[in-house]
């Protein structure tokens, strides 16, 4: 995409434009980060629309923990645990009530997760972390390149290899192609779906 834009838009690769692109990169990389496990859900032929609410609830509770003076590692663990629990809730409902469409289930959990966040904050409330030193660390840069770019690239390669080359990945494709056939082939359909939705929640955290 960068090469194509550079061909058709003269001056795109000028220094000031590239510097601005690098400055804004962390915002977009956060979305790319969530797309990595979402790819697995899409391969299943499903969708999870509760990711925004999961991020919201995880951020709310982790910020509250941060404002109590908890160590940064505890703040991070809080976010990861909350996200994982939200993902596990989605996975549990979808695997126990397989007749329910994923879009409807995750729409419902989206409302629930966001509602919990609003109850915690109060109507129209907001919250911010009082101690941002730890967040500055993970949001740091190597030169002008943000750390998260390297994390996203590493995770993208790992998840792509797992999906394309591993037995687990082939099973995910089999479930997405025909869930019933995959089940009668001996694939643990419920287990795999539960794992994928739980991992999605962890990434949201």
Indicate where each model-derived feature is located.
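Structural signal for alpha-helical transmembrane segments and their membrane-water exit/capping regions
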Residues: 1-16, 44, 117-121, 160-167
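Single transmembrane alpha-helix segments in multi-pass membrane proteins
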Residues: 3-10, 16-68, 93-98
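Alpha-helical transmembrane segments of multi-pass membrane proteins, especially transporters
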Residues: 27, 51-59, 75-83, 102, ...
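Small-residue-rich segments of transmembrane alpha-helices in multi-pass membrane proteins
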Residues: 28, 59-61, 108-117, 184-186
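Transmembrane alpha-helical segments of multi-pass membrane transport proteins and ion-pumping complexes
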Residues: 31, 35, 84-92, 118-119, ...
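Helix-loop-helix "hairpin" substructures at the membrane interface of multi-pass membrane proteins
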Residues: 71, 75-79, 85-90, 142-205
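Transmembrane helix-bundle core of multi-pass membrane transporters
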Residues: 100-165, 192-195
């Amino acid at each position: 995409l960068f090469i194509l834009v550079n061909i058709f838009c003269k001056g795109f690769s000028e220094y000031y434009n590239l510097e601005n692109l690098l400055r804004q990169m962390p915002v977009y990389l956060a979305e790319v980060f969530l797309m990595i496990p979402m790819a697995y859900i899409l391969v299943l032929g499903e969708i999870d629309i509760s990711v925004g609410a999961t991020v919201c609830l995880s951020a709310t509770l982790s910020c509250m923990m941060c404002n109590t003076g908890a160590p940064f590692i505890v703040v991070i663990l809080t976010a990861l645990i909350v996200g994982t629990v939200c993902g596990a809730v989605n996975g549990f409902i979808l695997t126990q009530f397989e007749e329910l469409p994923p879009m409807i289930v995750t729409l419902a959990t989206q409302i629930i997760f966001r509602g919990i966040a609003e109850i915690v904050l109060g109507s129209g409330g907001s919250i911010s972390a009082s101690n941002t030193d730890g967040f500055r660390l993970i949001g740091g840069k190597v030169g002008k390149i943000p750390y998260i770019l390297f994390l996203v690239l590493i995770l993208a390669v790992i998840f792509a290899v797992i999906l394309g080359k591993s037995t687990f990945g082939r099973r995910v494709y089999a479930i997405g192609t025909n869930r019933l056939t995959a089940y009668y082939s001996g694939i643990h359909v419920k287990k795999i779906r539960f794992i994928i939705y739980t991992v999605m929640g962890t990434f949201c955290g």
